[in-house]
Amino acid sequence: SMAIAMLIVTIALHAQRFVNTTLSGAQTVSAITQDANGMIWLGTDNGLYSYDGYHDYCHFAPHTFNHVRVNALGFEGSMLYMATANGMLQFDAKEETYVSTPAVEAYGDESRKKMQKELRVLDMKGRKDAFGPDVYAILHTQKGLLVGSLSGLRLNNRPILLTPGAQPLVNALAYDAIRHCYWIGTEGALYCADRSLQNFSRIEALNGNSVKCLDEDQDGNLYIGTDNGLYRMAMNNSLEHFVHDSRNAATIPNNIVWTCYVDKWQNVWIGTDNGLSRLSTHTFYRFTSLDKITFSGEGNFLHAILQTRNGEWWMGGTNGLIHYSEGVRAQG
């Protein structure tokens, strides 16, 4: 067993506030990613959505090839790759249009359509649609390709036994760059493996949980999505448990968590069986009254605002132009 002591205390936590969003026309959110501009993209039971923090936008049409369950998302430049129930789709986010793929071409041909297999993962470092419907998670490691499937865990096609006898379905894989270990989420348990992938330790406090997704923030907090809510493991191995409470609108909307994603601002996005949820660590807005910038009570009705690359602000309004840099008195 590993030398790392996994002493964990489970805490039922309700103090942290979740902001929940119901998508128009979709219920289950199964994949989340973010583009270079900060836009959040969502794979759902009905197709692709984007979300700008205010509104959701659907990118599918009913009864077409893109009206389909989306299991995984991955960006390569502005091209968004989608692992779906009918194979791989490609959406050019810049042009806001779908690109022709075998899955698109097969949609109108019943015989070819039946041959399309469900795709659950995307290999963004290899052939993106290389894996069949039995593969639920992949991870490139120093030792080779780690694959989680219906039949268990494999490294370079060599089985790794997690338990005696029949192997569990492996739903989620992640490398922990802070703890220098690998996390393996299965139907029934969460395992931690050393970098050699030789020694495995089961996290006893999570026994019996179906672990569906894993992600980590910059402070080393590990987010674990399960059929029993969301868990957060801190660096000291304490465990917090977030669950739905119908009496509290600031809790997660559903206890079945399909996907969790830490964005570039360290907000944690959670895809559930009942929509999208966000645990915010980043404040989207910073409010500064105009008199604190201009040191004047004259006021200004602003019509245009520009921020330069070096962080300076230019603001134009009914009472003239304001030039402002943080820490420097405004000029106007």
What are these regions (language model features)?
Residues 1-332:
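Carboxylate-rich, polar loop motifs that coordinate divalent cations or form catalytic acidic clusters
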